[in-house]
Structure formats: structure tokens, C-alpha cells
Amino acid sequence: LSLHDALPILYILQQAEGYNRTETKPICYNESVTDTLPRFTYMNPNDSNLVQLRKHFNLDSIAGSGDEISKIKNLLYWVHNIVPHDGNSRNPEERNTIAMVELCKKENRGVNCRMMAQMLNECYLAMGFKSRFITCMPKVMINDCHVINAVYSNTLDKWLWMDPTFNAYVTDEKGNLLGIGEVRERLRNNQPVVLNEDANWNNKNKQTKEYYLDYYMAKNLYYVTCPLQSEYNAETNYPGKKWPMYISLVPEGYSSNGKPGATAYDSHNDSYFWQSPYQE
């Protein structure tokens, strides 16, 4: 991929309008009308499903006994390696980590990026991290978007970009880990972003910064969306299931169009969307 191919994609992202940090209420779709910005919630690691997940895969030993960042990365590597990525696979009925790992082994198959990010999200929640799976969307959806994770580091007091499909995280030129909002902003401002050396697809194809960040993710960072409730079995449909509400962070002058049953809210306020999970 030449820079010539990436330029129009980066240009679209760079031409997006900015955010509005003074906005105090979201744009509401469906019947979910509210005058206040809704709260993000994170499932407690003592939830019985998360406790079972932690024990089932012995996540404590997978995370290891190093510092917080090493645990975050070890869980990323584990999900990247435990199932293959297959972007064309049909989504399983039961969308939780235990069920999906078993299904992939049994049927010798993979899952798509959305399922991989939900698995990593459950593992982070089970290990006591605040985490979300984030759908990264292009300005115009033609055939592809991408789903990754934002996990909150207490030691760095910020959200971090973790992508289980590509075993990927991003730093600045000094090696400081970056979050999704920071990567987007740096791409918009032509500031340096660095992809980890071992970023890859299915342990076969090495990923480059030029393709993965300047082209693929520049395309997919026009707006981002996630459920307000970060939980186990987030998108498994079962009797009595309360479907999560989704919120999109969109640039001013743009609308996600509140897809029925999915996006309930749009916000232009990035400091709200990326607020600390410990913020009162």
C-alpha cells in the first residue's frame, strides 16, 4: 500500500469536524429520551459468570504476576492466540468467551473481530479491569468496520487501545501507550503513532503502521460506538435478555442515524465518552 492510497482515507478523517466538550445531553433515538448524558457501567468481577470465566481459563496465571500493563498485554495475546480470526464467519448464537472458544475448537473455525473483542472484554472485566468493546466506524459504511477494546489503566489513568484481531496496541514516538481517542487525534494532526512490532493477523501476516493505522484504522475511526453497559454475554440473545443501549461518539455535523434497536444515542462530547470509569 502506498502513501498515495492512504492519503484520501486520512484526508476524510482530517476533514471531520471537531467534538464539543460543552455538550450536556445526547442526541436521542428510538424511545430512549434523556436530558442528561447516560452513565457507562462495568460489570463487577464478582459476578458469577465472570468468576466462572476467570477459573475456567485460569486467567490469573495467563495475566501473570507482573505490573498492570503486562497483565493487560498478556490477556490481549491470549485472546489473539486462543481462536483464529475469520472475518467471514457467521456469528455464534452464544457469544461469551467459554462458549466461543469451545465452538471454535469443536468446529475448527474462527470468529470475527466483534466476537474477539467481546471475548477480550469479558477477560478484562473478569480480571477487575474496566473495559469496553468499541466498534470503529467509517464515515460511509461500504463493507467493513472494525471492533477493538478500550481498557482502563489505573497506573496510567487513561484508556488504552488493545486490538485482539491484530494483537495490536499503539504508542507515541516515546513509547507511551495511547488510547483510541488519542490515536484518532494524532492521525488527524499528522503526529507520530507507532504500532507494536509483533502486531499480526492470525500469526501469519505482520501488520505495518502504514497499512493498519494510516489506512485501515484511519478509515474506521470516523466515529466510534459502544454499549453503555459493559458486561458478560453482551450480545447473546436469550429469554429475558435486556439488550444493551449503544452510544456513538460522532464529530459535529455527523449522525450515526440511530439504527433501530442499536444506537440509542449520539454524543459529540469526547471528554464524556472517554471519561474515567472512576469519575463520579
Predicted regions, residues:
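Low-complexity, Gly/Ser/Thr/Pro-rich intrinsically disordered linker/tail segments
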Residues: 189-280
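A structural signal for well-ordered alpha-helical segments within the folded catalytic domains
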Residues: 73, 111-122
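Short, small-residue-biased leader/transition segments that mark boundaries at the very start
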Residues: 1-7
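Short His-Asn-centered micro-motif
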Residues: 109-113, 134-136
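Hydrophobic/aromatic-rich core segments of domains that either
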Residues: 118-190
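N-terminal targeting leaders that direct proteins to extracytoplasmic destinations
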Residues: 8-16
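Secondary-structure boundary elements
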Residues: 17-111
